Amino acid sequence: MERLWELFQDESVANHGAFVIKKMLSNLALIFAVCFREWTNPLEDFILSAKTAHPLVRFGRQNDGAFNEGTIAQFLESSSPVFIGTFLTFSQIMAEELTKKDVSHTDKSDLHTAVHEKLFPTTESVATKIFTGTNGANTEMWNIWLPCFNSWVSYASKAEFDSTARYNMTPLLRIAVQRMANEPIPWKTDVPERIIDSLVESLDINSTFFVADTKNDLKALIFGPWGRQLLSVTPEVSDQFARLTILLLECDMVQLAMQIANEESSDVFEFLLRLTDFPGMPVVEETISSDFIEFWMQMVDSLTEDTERFKAYLDGDEAKISLFNKKSRALLNNVAHIYWRKIHIPVDEDAIKGYEEEFRVFRRDAGDLFEAIYPIVRNELYHSLSGNVLYAVEQFKNSKVPQGEERAVLNDIEASMYLINAISEDFSEENAPQEIVEDVYRLLNSEVLQLVTGYRVQGSFQHFIYTAIRFVASVSWFYGTEQGLTCLPVILNFLFDNMMDSPTYELISSRAIAEICDNCRLSLQETLPNFKNIVTEMIENVSVDSITRERIINSYSSIIQGVRDPQVQGEYLHRLLELLLKHSTEMLNRLDGLPKEQLDQVKEYLISIISCVSAIGRGMQLPDAPEDVYTDPKELQLVSKYWTEDPLGIHAQILQIVQNFAMGSEQLSDNLKVAEEIEAIFKSGLTESMPGPFVFPPELITQFITAKIATLKTFNTLPLLYDLFGKVIRANHRDMSAESVSRTLEQIWTGFQSQKVDSSDPDIVQALIGMLAAIAGSSPGMLLRDSRLLQAVVVFCIEQLGSKERFVLQSLEQFWTKLIHLRRGNRQDTITVRRLFDETDLGHMLMYNLLKSLLVTQRSNISYFTEILKAVVAKYPMLAKQWMMQSLEKINRERLESGQKAVSEYELFVKRVMLTRGTRTANGLVKDFWLKTNGLVDYDRRL
């Protein structure tokens, strides 16, 4: 404090050293946070120091009578505005430092109590006397006070959360509201605007500080002549005015919603609608409409979720409830109409240049609002939007659109369809009301799609065309209805035309086709011939986008999957795969002779072709269990028989394509993307429980894996092969002979141990251990039957406990817990594993390496080691204690010899862990042991 007063005496500091003074005030605040029991009120001492003109610190003697009711008045009368402002700055800094300060749990409550009882009352008294006295209109004083007030709001909110202290902000808020209300409009100073900012911030931080009287005073201002005059004379404050209105009303949204049917409140809702419809382009010229979306969403939530409260409020009177619902719908229809106009793409699209992303988000949020409004307004909203489209289309059809107005009318259609899309996403064939089905039918039978095609040819109007394409996909549920079936051929032709004739709309059209085909596969059987030319073009045309090609092939195959007759299904698949095999073979044969400039394009095409085969596999997967798809047992038997016999050799076609890519091409055989797609091809049939086009014998897939491993030139695809073998075992272990699996495992292990494979590559190691974990978890006997291999595997998995790679440790946890618990093992498997732990040094080796690695691992990896430890303790309780004690004694000795910190209290740790018997209780014990051994503190627990 003495140093602070010295700075006040230094003219150069007083005039230009605000930063130095603030730093000193900050230091005093930090001292108070530590010594608040001895130095209970630094703010009083500041005032006393100013009054006596020399520094005073009453450390430990606060109740000496030096500060009384008249002291503040004397301070304000005798001090300069600069000095009074410094006091407010000191109070602000005090609140800010206390907000940031992290104190111990025991001190926290006492500190908050001291501040609530001492510092805040002093600040409140000074502020009240300043702004009800001669300095009440002082602009500079207000500009200092408002940041101080905001800081106290932030601190008080934190203090109320952390303690029993409860703050009464009403007197200070009332002063601010009165100052704002009394300022003549137009404002001559920035104080009222800053007060609005301060009120917005306070409401945002903690609206409970605004009691009913304060909120009513503010509402009277906002919805009265003051608010209307302010918006008409000072539109530049409209954004913050709207924020103030929104935050104030959101505090009592249910109460506000209850007033919808009250005539006295109609002006309030009219005012809110006018604010929502504030003039200007959203985002670019005004943000009020954007801010109000969340407000109206909350209103809708209240109307949807609080219906019982509204009924009680209306005394269960059916007439009142009916009127309330009617007025609610009318209000939301008005809101919807405002946002329908607001989301329009401007005729001059340059108007949103630089704001494209923000405007897109605004439209998306408006769409979400319409989706929320629909359950209240119901079909009236959908009918209104579809009516807008039909009317505009009719205007075009009858040439009634004035010249030069075409773009504006198209934007009307686009806005309506955009919002129809938002609502339509939630419907399904089962829940769509008949009136909505009729509306969609009328839309699709109007000339709207012809209009889209016509303007697409002109090469402009992208928003309109995108939204129209999105529309036909958003109503995919409609095509399953009786009326929708009649529209399907037209819709698909429309999408195919857009996809094939315009690269701009290729991707969105292919996505729409994929959505429709996926949702309507059973309704699209008769359209399969229509796909023939499209599919041929997709496969033969190298320049087609890869994503488009894969989507269309997947869509086509999903329709084929829905064909009930397996012979017809097989013929379609055979022709499709024949086309893929023919063109991929031709391209693969030409690959080596291509010039460099063509090579990349052809490689991309070929990768897309193998991806198409994978896409067919996904499309051909049964959507449900076989008995649910083929409810007639005879039909199920017929389909199974067909795919078992495979008269058209479809399995051979698929395998030939795989063979060509995996082993027939120098340039693609080790390509990672190719390997991923081949794995996906085999995986697509692994989960099927009946014969099918992509269901292969597990031995065949295993043969492919071993042959592929033997021909690898690089090993970046090796993890995928390990992963595939693990999945084959998991899916088919009941049908595979232990001998053949053991033989394959031996080949894989020998290959891994060879000098060619980088056994330190974490991706390869993780995949190998993951494969072993899959075997241990599904059919452990296949791993246990070869004792020599088993010995090598467990030694390797013990060594890998020292890995720093998180995903390697994750796989190790799975391997060891599955091997120890042996939930899928038979009696012989259990005997084999128990003998390993009982009769060899495996248990001790595992425990030593486990604990040693645990103590040096990262905190985020502790859980992996803990799970293994819990498994050992649960399964081998008698031996685990001995292994743990011996291991920790050895680890402790090694640490001391190397100058490291000792392992503290490990005997107690062992006792406690053993008491848990491998349950979740051990988790906290292991973490605490790790923290203590590493000299760390669990700050989460301290707090």
What are these model-derived regions, one by one?
Residues 1-943:
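Karyopherin-beta/Importin-beta family HEAT-repeat alpha-solenoid scaffold
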